[in-house]
Amino acid sequence: MPLYEGLGSGGEKTAVVIDLGEAFTKCGFAGETGPRCIIPSVIKKAGMPKPIKVVQYNINTEELYSYLKEFIHILYFRHLLVNPRDRRVVVIESVLCPSHFRETLTRVLFKYFEVPSVLLAPSHLMALLTLGINSAMVLDCGYRESLVLPIYEGIPVLNCWGALPLGGKALHKELETQLLEQCTVDTGAAKEQSLPSVMGSIPEGVLEDIKVRTCFVSDLTRGLKIQAAKFNIDGNTERPSPPPNVDYPLDGEKILHVLGSIRDSVVEILFEQDNEEKSVATLILDSLMQCPIDTRKQLAENLVIIGGTSMLPGFLHRLLAEIRYLVEKPKYKKTLGTKTFRIHTPPAKANCVAWLGGAIFGALQDILGSRSVSKEYYNQTGRIPDWCSLNNPPLEMVFDVGKSQPPLMKRAFSTEK
């Protein structure tokens, strides 16, 4: 907990900030520079061979409730070591988070843990607080998908978002496919056995470790050559010389030979255009095309990239090169209206930027109180405001009793003096 905690506004204890990601959860306290813990978003059940993912959108509500209850209990009483009744909660969420998941999560926090208030904060908006800017094009490359959302003058431009199922999960699937097809394993019994004969599938944790330790993103010229050789339409395209092979130890007894050609080709699926000519780079350009023309220049010059997948070596350099390459094509050249693109460097690792923004916002105790859903309101109504609902109650009914009416959204998230 921060030093001099009792000297805040009215001596109120600092808020708990939770970024509940599909692969990893970041958790800590407002006002701190980094999360106290980054743990896999899973729980272990007796009799279950594999850990159970907590963030699931296709299971029934009661099952989800029990998973979230157990997982948040672990956060509070194994990692944070604080009483949940004493502290407000800031939850970092995706704007595409299904309503039933948000409602189940808030039910767990209010009914089971009895927290004083909950603020559900969009991850893209929170990322801007770390940079002190009002307008940016924010791309979140996470585990399940890559999601882009423009923020202009502190307001998310919701009709210009874009998403593709390109993230850590897609990389793991591609990596596993290539490893099983091409790689060999040395065991105590024999050398260079085919991987499928030794193990039918590769655990998710091993795939992630191989990805992080060995894979990287090639530059644009090399990447285009790798893609051309992969599809080999004209039949005479040569692949660039691969990087060195890597020997990866499996469970202390086996050695997996990871081919160099796999190390640089796996990540190309993020930049290969599919049948609809979509990739991570076109996500940004297509979103920009949907924005009002007088906002495009400012948004293009303020790109913010967050999410764990964007931490791969060479990712940002390649993304910027792809954008500058694509913007010269006829589809964008005549209509986009700008050719200058710049990427910000946030003051935290890409996977923790949204959490840090939530920690900054959670430290503003007066504003936090005026923007949070209070326990009293939730107990009366059993519901929370939802941006995609047309049946939201008046603002003065939602926020803490005794607090002044909340400022306009623009002012609440503005960094202007």
UniProtKB/Swiss-Prot annotation:
InterPro entries documented for this protein: Actin, ATPase_NBD
CDD domains linked: ASKHA_NBD_Arp10
Keyword Chloroplast attached: no
One record GO biological process: retrograde axonal transport of mitochondrion
SUPFAM superfamilies, per the entry: Actin-like ATPase domain
Subunit: Subunit of dynactin, a multiprotein complex part of a tripartite complex with dynein and a adapter, such as BICDL1, BICD2 or HOOK3. The dynactin complex is built around ACTR1A/ACTB filament and consists of an actin-related filament composed of a shoulder domain, a pointed end and a barbed end. Its length is defined by its flexible shoulder domain. The soulder is composed of 2 DCTN1 subunits, 4 DCTN2 and 2 DCTN3. The 4 DCNT2 (via N-terminus) bind the ACTR1A filament and act as molecular rulers to determine the length. The pointed end is important for binding dynein-dynactin cargo adapters.
Family recorded in the similarity comment: Belongs to the actin family.
Biological function: Part of the dynactin complex that activates the molecular motor dynein for ultra-processive transport along microtubules.
Protein name: Actin-related protein 10
Gene source species: Sus scrofa
